[in-house]
Amino acid sequence: MANITLKPLCPLLEEMVQLPNHSNSSLRYIDHVSVLLHGLASLLGLVENGLILFVVGCRMRQTVVTTWVLHLALSDLLAAASLPFFTYFLAVGHSWELGTTFCKLHSSVFFLNMFASGFLLSAISLDRCLQVVRPVWAQNHRTVAAAHRVCLMLWALAVLNTVPYFVFRDTIPRRDGRIMCYYNMLLLNPGSDRDTTCDYRQKALAVSKFLLAFMVPLAIIASSHVAVSLQLHHRGRQRTGRFVRLVAAIVVAFILCWGPYHIFSLLEARAHSVTTLRQLASRGLPFVTSLAFFNSVVNPLLYVLTCPDMLHKLRRSLLTVLESVLVEDSDLSTGPGKRCRRRHRRRASSTTTPASTLLLADRFPQLRPARLIGWMRRGSAELPRRVREQSQEKQGSLSCTLD
């Protein structure tokens, strides 16, 4: 109780500190469901984004497009990694038990993901616009190294914008013994006029993140889309590529997940002077914050659903890992001689039986070997479409989303 009066608090925060813990059975049931959903989302987000990073970073040819997706997945992975701690906060009764330093770090990861996502989506839209509007310039300057440099600059800018949220984040004890991890606008240089300082700082943070992390990226995305559409219409091209559909899906998810959070942040800033908004802001912010967290879970699903090649690579990567584990386990019970003979048989079978011959024999079992060889000598033009599609798939670019 003594700790509550030691720190100067803003009026809104003082009101939140006095709120008792709810004892309604229906609300407790909602809390249990919320903990379950957040736990599943945290597990799903970690697995999804980890797999996307592995596939895009290790299994696909590195292009400018894969560079953007790689950094977006890294941002989402950071947010997903912080979600289990938020789930623990909900599970122990909405009380932060992990200390002040980790409170600052956990909140900073949330805002870092917010800024990084907005900045990276803006860069992707500008990159697409330059490809269409300035193709010669893009061909000369658009490289993977340049894309990585741009991403590093955007990460630095996101970290810079996250600093105020790290500075003003604090742990505040409640009246009922629980601990809040929230803004304390009077934590640093409170000044003589408490109400003015709280109102100014809260509005400055809410408006700045609304503009820099939401409105400005949306304006860049919209203007880039208009420029690309006009240029393609002028050239007589109306085809929508996979990468365009992927970006559109990510932008829609970004708006739906982050839009409500920014609206309630502005309401919270307004609630310092308009007391009637305080209950609405305090009730709605936890829900929209969870919705913003779920954006890091939705994005990997969009990558897989929009790009079939991503799903193919993901399946093949999982199959390769599983096969390696099973082979290692079976090798433990066999001697080195048997392992060598088994590898030799695999090499011999792969060299003596080409894949195309197996496919042809499977497709045309009625052909005898002599007739099959004669039929194959007529030329590759008569090969089954199944064989040609597989060869084209191997030779094609792995970054199918550029089309």
UniProtKB/Swiss-Prot annotation:
Cellular localisation: Cell membrane
Topology of this chain in the membrane: Multi-pass membrane protein
Lineage: superkingdom: Eukaryota
Regions of this protein lying in the Extracellular compartment: 1-34, 93-104, 169-209, 267-284
GO biological process, one term: adenylate cyclase-inhibiting G protein-coupled receptor signaling pathway
Gene3D superfamilies: Rhodopsin 7-helix transmembrane proteins
Stretches that traverse the bilayer: 35-55, 72-92, 105-125, 148-168, 210-230, 246-266, 285-305
Database matches in InterPro entries: Formyl_rcpt-rel (IPR000826), GPCR_Rhodpsn (IPR000276), GPCR_Rhodpsn_7TM (IPR017452)
Comp. bias (Polar residues): 393-403
Motif Involved in the recycling of CRTH2: where in chain: 329-332
Annotated GO CC locations: neuron projection; plasma membrane
Glycosylated position list: 3, 21, 24
Listed name of the protein: Prostaglandin D2 receptor 2
Domain remarks in the Swiss-Prot or TrEMBL record: The 329-DSEL-332 motif is involved in the recycling of PTGDR2 to the cell surface after agonist-induced internalization. This motif seems to be required for GRK2 and GPRK5/GRK5 to promote agonist-induced internalization. Thr-351 is a major site for PKC-induced internalization of the receptor.
Start and end residues of each stretch annotated as Disordered: 332-353, 384-403
Basic residues bias: start-end ranges: 338-348
Any one GO MF annotation of this record: prostaglandin F receptor activity
Family the UniProt entry places it in: Belongs to the G-protein coupled receptor 1 family.
Record keywords, A-Z: Cell membrane, Disulfide bond, G-protein coupled receptor, Glycoprotein, Membrane, Phosphoprotein, Receptor, Transducer, Transmembrane, Transmembrane helix
PTM annotation: Phosphorylated.
Residues bearing PTM Phosphoserine: 330, 349
Recorded coiled-coil stretches: none
Function noted in UniProt: Receptor for prostaglandin D2 (PGD2). Coupled to the G(i)-protein. Receptor activation may result in pertussis toxin-sensitive decreases in cAMP levels and Ca(2+) mobilization. PI3K signaling is also implicated in mediating PTGDR2 effects. PGD2 induced receptor internalization. CRTH2 internalization can be regulated by diverse kinases such as, PKC, PKA, GRK2, GPRK5/GRK5 and GRK6. Receptor activation is responsible, at least in part, in immune regulation and allergic/inflammation responses.
